[in-house]
Structure formats: C-alpha cells, structure tokens
UniProtKB/Swiss-Prot annotation:
Cofactor(s) listed: pyridoxal 5'-phosphate
Keywords: Lyase, Pyridoxal phosphate
Source organism of the structure: Mycobacterium tuberculosis (strain CDC 1551 / Oshkosh)
Family: Belongs to the class-V pyridoxal-phosphate-dependent aminotransferase family. EgtE subfamily.
Primary gene name: egtE
Protein name, entry field: Probable hercynylcysteine sulfoxide lyase
Length: 395
C-alpha cells in the first residue's frame, strides 16, 4: 500500500529528494521526529543567524539605528508576503501573529454594520476576536468534509450580503484545503471584501488569489521565528480602515498602515521571518506545495489501517496535514504525550476549542514538512500503534 502511494505521489522523485535534502541541510539536526509544522516549523540556520545578527547589531549601535539598517530586509519580507498573497501592491504590516493581525483588522473595520460570514469550523480564538469587536457571525454552508459549498454560499451571500467574508483556507483541526480561488472570484463578483486567514495556508497551499486581506503567521509553514505575523491589505481597503488607536494631532502624519504597525516590536524576529520568506521563494513555492501534498498522501495511506483511529481527510487532499479522529476510546491527549516522552515524536493534540462550533471531540494531528520522509511516516505509524496500546488503560 505504501509503495503504491509513493508511486502515485512521486515522493521519491529526484526533484522531491533534492528539495527535501536542501531543506534538511539548511537546518539544525532534528532531535527526534518532528511532525508538527502546522504548529511550529523548524527554523533554518539562515533565519536563526539573521535574527541573532540583528540582535547583536542592536547591542552595537542601538535598537533604532539597527532597525533603520534592517529596512531593506523588512521591505523584502513585505514584498514576499504581497507576492504570495497575489496582491503585489498590498500594504503589509508586521504583527505578533495571526490573531493579532485579525484583531488589528476587525478593530479598525469601517462603519457601524458588523456582520461577517465564515465557516462553521472557524478557529475558536478567531471567533472570540470577532465577538470582541461586535461582529455578528453567519455560518457559510459547507459540504460533509467541511469544504465550503460554493453554490449554496453564492445564493446566501447574494441574498443577504455580510460586511465581509472571512475564510480560513486550512483549518487548525482538519487538513482540508478550501477552494480559495473560487471563493475569491465569487466575492469579487458580489463586491464583498474577502479576508483570508492564511495561518495554515501561507507556504502550504496556494494563497495568491488577490484577496482584499490576507493575514498569516511566521512560525508555521514558512518556518520563521515565533511571535511574528503579517497583515496584507489591498490599498483601497487600507485607506478605509480606522485605526483603533489613531495618531494624535500633535504627531507627524502617519499612513493607516503605519498607525496599525505603530508600537514596540521584536525587529530581530521580523528580520528572521523575512529571511525565511526569501528561502521559501528560493526553494520554489509550487515545488514546496507539491512536496507537502505528496507527504499528506503517503501519511494518510500509511495510517489508514491503524487500529483505534480514523483518518479524517481524503487520501488525495492537497495538504500535508493528516487528522486522526479516535475510535474505540483512543485518547489523543495521552497518545500525544506518550509519543513525545517515549519516542520523541512531536505531534499536536487538538481540543474542541480549536473549532467549538464544529469539532465534536479532540483529535490528533500530524503535519510533516518537506524534509520528512516516507520512512518517518512509517516510524510514526508503528509508534502510534504502540502509543495507542500503551495508553489504552489510562481511560
């Protein structure tokens, strides 16, 4: 079965091997088995060194002088995000992460009407931010696998248009890739602003659809530092936003983007993120996406027959994430802990708070990056069998 999956996916192709080897060689050796890139990928030597070098430069010349010297690197990072979002003229603001980006956006949204349409499987913390800013959330219609039902969504959005459509392109609790390009086209036709949560999408699936807003994190598939994110906004929309903390009259004039980005910042982390973005572009976004989809195919095939678990995604889902739903009483939290303590395998336990309007029970998630191999996934499958058996008495 595994051989068939590998033949179908081409995971042993020279191109795949070259990318995997290049990605692996660019990073410190892994301590164990890392299958958790949807949570936090492993940074490269270049990203680590760039952040450290900037921090040293701050110590040498002062933080503000060092920040001025880093302007070109940060501009390159912004340009990379704009390109990966399909909006070359986007105004890009660095944030501390995806949730911060959404908070900045919704806190600055113009007008008094506050309605948005999003998937029933929306990320729990996103729902909290939406509620905090007074947005009325309307669920988009979906298919059985959680993918947006385009025809039904078109009718709903045309019949009663919300102020914006918010689409999380890949969820936190399930590795289904939403039809982003089709949703973008629909929103354009209906003249509805489209906001894309690309926290799990940037560097993983194609996000270059020219949405009005795209926001994302550094630490996931781009493999940058923690504590950094981005908010990319179409210029026309950016000018309509009203910063929650607008610049006072006595300050020099600031653009809306400058107002949103005003405040203290870890510039070293932003430099590391910008370098990671450059590495991603150098490796080839399309090649990375193809390799990640291959690994998802292999993982789901290898894990399909593991007792005690059900693979949630279809084998050919074009993402690297495999979600394992427990059956017969398997305990995702206990299994995750056992895998880490006994085999040094890093995975994610996803509780119902990840998608409180949809997820009925906790799940286990794996998310290999391009340097992982079929042997890694075989090793995980064997360890999962052992972990399930070892923790069966803990229920």
């Amino acid at each position: 079965m595994q051989d068939e999956a590998m033949r179908r996916s081409g995971a042993n192709s020279p191109a795949g091997d070259s990318l995997a080897d290049r990605w692996r060689a660019a990073r410190p050796p892994v301590a164990g088995l890392h299958l958790d890139s949807a949570a936090c990928s492993r940074q490269s030597f270049a990203a680590l060194d760039a952040a450290a070098q900037h921090a040293r430069h701050e110590a040498e010349v002062g933080g503000y002088v060092a920040a001025e010297a880093a302007a070109a690197v940060l501009d390159a990072g912004r340009a990379a995000v704009a390109a990966l979002s399909g909006l070359p003229d986007a105004e890009v603001v660095f944030t501390t992460g995806s949730l911060h980006a959404l908070d900045l956006l919704l806190g600055s949204w113009p007008g008094e009407n506050r309605t948005l349409a999003c998937l029933p499987g929306e990320y729990g913390p996103n729902l909290a931010v939406m509620a905090a800013h007074g947005f009325d959330v309307r669920p988009l219609p979906t298919l059985q696998d959680g993918r947006v039902a385009l025809d039904d969504a078109a009718f709903m959005l045309a019949d009663d248009p919300p102020d914006l459509v918010h689409l999380t392109v890949v969820a936190s609790h399930r590795g289904v890739a939403q039809p982003l390009a089709m949703v973008a086209q629909l929103c354009t036709e209906l003249k509805l602003p489209l906001v894309v949560d690309a926290a799990q999408g940037l560097g993983h699936v194609d996000c270059a659809v020219g949405a009005d807003v795209t926001y994302a994190s550094s630490r996931k598939w781009i493999a940058g530092p923690r504590g950094v994110g981005v908010l990319a906004v179409r210029p026309e929309l950016m000018e309509r936003l009203r910063a929650r903390l607008p610049a006072p009259d006595w300050m020099p004039p600031l653009t809306v983007a400058q107002q949103l980005g005003f405040g203290e910042a870890n510039v070293a982390a932003r430099v590391g993120f910008s370098v990671a973005l450059g590495e991603h572009l150098a490796c080839g976004p399309q090649a990375i996406r193809a390799r990640l989809a291959e690994l998802g195919d292999i993982a789901r095939t290898v894990l399909a027959d593991v007792s005690g678990w059900r693979v949630v995604e279809a084998v050919d889902e074009p993402s690297a994430i495999t979600t394992l739903a427990p059956i017969d009483g398997a305990d995702p939290a206990a299994v995750r802990a056992w895998l880490l303590s006994q085999r040094r395998i890093v995975t994610t336990y996803a509780g119902v708070e990840r998608a409180p309007l949809e997820l009925p029970a906790p799940v286990l998630r794996i998310s290999p990056h391009v340097d992982n191999t079929a042997d890694d996934l075989d090793a995980f499958a064997e360890a999962l069998v052992a972990a399930t058996a070892a923790t069966s008495g803990e229920r």
